[in-house]
Amino acid sequence: MQGTKKALFVGGLLLAVVSSGVQAEALQPDPAWQQGKLDNGFTWQLLTTPQRPGDRVELRLVVNAGSLLENAQQVGFAHFLPRLALAPGDKLSAAQRPSMWTRDANSSRVLPPVVVSYDFTSYNLSLPNNRPELLKEALTWLSESAGQMAFDEKSLQAALKVPDQVATFPVNPQDPSWRYRLKGSPLLAHDPAQDVKPPLNGEQLQQFYKTWYTPDAMTLYIVGHVDNRSVIEQIGKVFSPLEGKREAPAPLPTLSPLPPQAISLMNNNVQQDTLSLMWDAPWHPIRESQALVRYWLGDMTREAMFWHLQQALEKSSLKSNNLRFDCNVFYTRSQCAIHMDVPNSEAVEPGVTFMARELATLREKGLTQQEFDALIARKTDELNKLFATYARTSTDILMDQRLRSQQNGVVDIAPEQYQKLRQTYLSALTLDMLNQELHQQLAQDTTLMLIQQPGEPEANMKALQETYDQIMTPTAEPVASAAAAAPEEKKPQETAPVAQ
């Protein structure tokens, strides 16, 4: 119980220190992002980037409609509608298409023209800079796709004959680890990659389109060096005629908590095994400074934990293994994981033993003052380069960041407010605070997952779990204390946002 109370006190102390410096202010949206709403409910967001005059102009029309809306007679409709929009016809000539989607030759990123998921469809365009006439054509095409598609037999057949260019999120909804993550969720029965099955009923498809493709469920995002006054005027001109209104709200996608039981999954598309330690928790929006501080504290702690493991791995006999770390938010759940790539199943147990020993030591001893000082120095250096980094951030990255913030309920703040809050936070943070957060995070339930390559015998996950638990279990006295504190240890987790 004492450890839990101390963690709560230290976390509260940091919040108090930071909040006193910034007066616990609400996060103010970055005014550089202009926003508007038309009379029909259509919304738009625009970021002009004079600091990036040579970048392409990025457009995303996000419709809050995906495969989760389909019933048994409508399977594949959400995926087929973009195919219909992309089919060559009077509205989109073959000459226009390359300019709207082809990136520069030196770009490594591939932009799919449309992405369909469970709860959204995103129409994506990337235009050459300084081509205002092409921007007008792009806005017109987006408007026509959003509310003026034709459903005659000729159009339907043309769409069926064109190769499917529509991507999905996630990229592979049939990935074994993703399917396992969806267990207990209605999403499992609504694959966004599912295409329509013949015969295609045009009337049913059109009704689905009119029901869910309504202007009050659409947002247009634009990032680039454009004439904002002209663009805003054009948006009103081409999107105001859209009609319709949602008569019923769309169902919200949800995920169940990740089961703590160890699991092994076979994946035919991998050539090595991957051992993962996964932490799953609720995600909470970030709209005020205290929530942002909680997020930063958890995020820096996870980063410190990963770099500690990385340095230990480089000094061990397992240094040929690759170590990765990621955090993602999926439908109000946050999932962070440490992944170790190993050549085969025989290397799994040494990997489990290594990670458990290092994490157990880190939980009990914490970071050293030297490690903490290095972390603060690195973060301070990043903060000092904030405006230079922002000036170098390309329009496609700025767009991705905006969409992620919108999806996760995070208020995008101006660089000036970010710098002020971040500096106050870094100045208030101490080694003891970070180590208490580290101890708390490593006391949470962890799911052990193993992705195996085809042809291998299935790993004994029960034995691997026992190996992990034996190392991670504290000595007798802390066990009793942890057992007494168990009901309260989850409380800080419920209130602390975690990494995106």
Short names for language-model regions:
Residues 202-237, 445-447:
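Non-catalytic, conformational "gating/processing" segments within enzyme and secreted inhibitor domains
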Residues 16-21:
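N-terminal signal peptide c-region/cleavage motif recognized by signal peptidases
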Residues 98-208, 277, 353-357, 367-399:
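Acidic/histidine-enriched segments that form metal/cofactor-coordinating
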Residues 219-276, 280-284, 455-456, 462-490:
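An aromatic/glycine/proline-enriched structural segment found at the starts
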Residues 41, 61, 79-80, 123, ...:
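Buried hydrophobic packing residues in well-ordered domains
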Residues 25-26, 219-224, 376, 380-500:
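C-terminal regions of mature proteins
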Residues 25-34, 170, 177-218, 252-254, ...:
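Histidine-acidic residue clusters that define the catalytic metal-binding segment
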Residues 58-126, 187-191, 199, 303-324, ...:
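M16/MPP (pitrilysin/insulinase) zinc-metallopeptidase core fold and M16-derived inactive scaffolds
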